[in-house]
Amino acid sequence: MTATIIDGKETAKEKRGQLAKEVEELKKQGVTPGLAVILIGDDPASLSYVRGKKKAAEAMGIRFQLDHFDASFTEQELLEVIDQYNQNDDFHGILVQLPLPDHISEQAVIERISPEKDVDGFHPLNVGKMLLGEDTFLPCTPAGIVELLKKTEIDLSGKEVVVVGRSNIVGKPVGQLLLNENATVTYCHSRTADITAHTKKADILIVAVGKANFIKADQIKEGAVVIDVGVNRLDNGKLAGDVDFEEAKEKASYITPVPGGVGPMTITMLAHNTVKSAKRTIQL
């Protein structure tokens, strides 16, 4: 068996086309969706992500504003910038690019962003709504993963899902979203005694640990759906996921590649949340 590739680029392209039309409709009603991104310091990965967000947002007709400050910018100064955007009706989404320098509290920053403009879906109020299955801004990568799974037309209800990784950004929320879809969810992490015992039971295996080629084919159930969230740069400069792709694609039924799998969906769902926020201002 060779797995069917879940093409994140193609799914993202379709969704972005839809969003561009929605932006046009909003503009006809006098509302241009606006996204403010705040970047502290010069982390190369963060710079790359922000460039990707800018390009995608502008292609969909979303107003994009980047405020880039050097690494010495204080927490208080950052909170004041967030306050200004909270009050600015031209911007419907506010995103502070993570990670932040050590002297700035990520939690303080996340909680300062208005829940109505929290297009990353990280504010505790929005996380709580997600847990309850209420309508809210969903975290972008987990929401993108669910969209990709739905594109495969796999019925998620009753499936055994194993999530390797328990970060607040991907692992925890993606498990919760799939629980909301009636899947049976198991989390594995660095303290799990025997990860393979769990992964081999998974109908759907989601891996988000940030370690290149961490999961091998012998840890995967025959015919499983494999979602690889990792993006790791190897010594030769190439990108690799958290799953050994060449091995795993001979065992899985569906698999996401790296790059071109989950990544394009993350930015797409950020745009989706920004448009959703703009619609709320005119009660669409």
Swiss-Prot record:
PROSITE patterns: THF_DHG_CYH_1 (PS00766), THF_DHG_CYH_2 (PS00767). GO terms for biological process: L-histidine biosynthetic process; methionine biosynthetic process; purine nucleotide biosynthetic process; tetrahydrofolate interconversion. Gene3D superfamilies: Leucine Dehydrogenase, chain A, domain 1 (3.40.50.10860), NAD(P)-binding Rossmann-like Domain (3.40.50.720). GO terms for molecular function: methenyltetrahydrofolate cyclohydrolase activity; methylenetetrahydrofolate dehydrogenase (NADP+) activity. GO terms for cellular component: cytosol. InterPro entries: Aminoacid_DH-like_N_sf, NAD(P)-bd_dom_sf, THF_DH/CycHdrlase, THF_DH/CycHdrlase_cat_dom, THF_DH/CycHdrlase_CS, THF_DH/CycHdrlase_NAD-bd_dom. Keywords: Amino-acid biosynthesis, Histidine biosynthesis, Hydrolase, Methionine biosynthesis, Multifunctional enzyme, NADP, One-carbon metabolism, Oxidoreductase, Purine biosynthesis. Pathway: One-carbon metabolism; tetrahydrofolate interconversion. It catalyses: (6R)-5,10-methylene-5,6,7,8-tetrahydrofolate + NADP(+) = (6R)-5,10-methenyltetrahydrofolate + NADPH; (6R)-5,10-methenyltetrahydrofolate + H2O = (6R)-10-formyltetrahydrofolate + H(+). Its EC number is 1.5.1.5, 3.5.4.9. NADP(+) binds at residues 165-167, 190, 231. Belongs to the tetrahydrofolate dehydrogenase/cyclohydrolase family. Catalyzes the oxidation of 5,10-methylenetetrahydrofolate to 5,10-methenyltetrahydrofolate and then the hydrolysis of 5,10-methenyltetrahydrofolate to 10-formyltetrahydrofolate. Homodimer. This is Bifunctional protein FolD.
